[in-house]
């Protein structure tokens, strides 16, 4: 029985030895399991350890079975050659063990090594040196840290090259740039547009169309593009000014009676004279004979209906006459927005839009709203630090000029809005004719038609500046 078992045991030992030899590297005490030391490689723990170049080591016959490799005192180029020749290599150790190994500071070799599928098990102990000579801030880096810096530099260099290529192209658009420091003018002034003849569909029938590109025009069209009908700059300017003036007038609506003017609609009842108002005549309900108001816009001469106000001004009464002051003609007379020379011209508005596109401001308002476009200029003025982002001095001066013009127009429109609001209040509500007389006494411009004074009982008209109002002709108050 023992004689049969012994050959079997020997067979197993021989098979195991041959198997261990075939799965190089394998830790063993027998030198025959590893390459000869004289060739520059042998086994060390679970690694095949080499200290000579791949050509000298002569391990080509074992290259398919080597999965772990330790290289001693070799240059990075030789390490890369080992990795390229060993297809099943999984891990590599760079030594000698326990001692920092220094490689030349080369991004190409380090990135190639770190980008391979082979893992460097002691990458934190491997350093590159001589980096100051290559323009780095330090002379020595660990391999992992240097690989990270190389990737970062590569990204920056490729991005810079792409940016230079983009800026040199003919279709460069200033509105697509990431920073205003790159300038406010595109590299190319013209765009070559190839339009193919749709009728024939032949490549030889392509025609070249050259058109000037205006970045500010494109910016304006971009903002207005989602609307069904694009508006011109003049339309936007007109709407902006009209909307702003309307809001100023609304804001002044709560100040009736200010600025030395009497409260609109607050005239006294008939027969009760009050200082600053024209006499309204006898109390309503009595039917005296009344003369027609001077100007011809009132009721016919005779007795007005019971309860009807007497002495209505032009267009001011709810029942008498037709609208007068406050119409389009008066708006044209008293509003400075009608004058062509006092509006923001299209050129200045184009410059403003160019700056908005160049500074890439996060707009806090809807630029499609004409009133908000005015708020945007106010936002620029109140946040003057935004001007520091405009690198072009000429463009910065243009923005400052536009801001100054806008501020002056806001002040003028505010005054016009208050004035128009007072004028409208003079011709609305009860007692408007009396308020008109007080407004005239305060130096307001004359109005067409309207009552020139109160009425006496029996149809006897008072002094043309009658009532208890101030007469600007004499400088004294007249008692009716």
UniProtKB/Swiss-Prot annotation:
GO biological process, one term: cell adhesion
First and last residue of the signal peptide: 1-20
Region (Fucose-binding domain): 377-385
Pfam family, one: Bindin
UniProt biased composition (Basic and acidic residues): 197-211
Protein location: Cytoplasmic vesicle, Secretory vesicle, Acrosome membrane
Membrane topology qualifier: Single-pass membrane protein
Keyword annotations of the record: Cell adhesion, Cleavage on pair of basic residues, Cytoplasmic vesicle, Fertilization, Membrane, Signal, Transmembrane, Transmembrane helix
Transmembrane segments annotated in the record for this chain: 431-451
Residue stretch(es) of the prosequence: 21-247
Chief subcellular location: membrane
GO annotations of cellular component type: acrosomal membrane
Region Disordered, annotated ranges: 161-211, 452-480
The protein's role, per its UniProt record: Species-specific sea urchin sperm protein required for adhesion of sperm to the egg surface during fertilization. Bindin coats the acrosomal process after it is externalized by the acrosome reaction. It binds to sulfated, fucose-containing polysaccharides on the vitelline layer receptor proteoglycans which cover the egg plasma membrane.
Family: Belongs to the bindin family.
Further details from the record: A.punctulata bindin forms multilamellar structures reminiscent of lipid bilayers.
Name of protein: Bindin
Source organism per UniProt: Arbacia punctulata
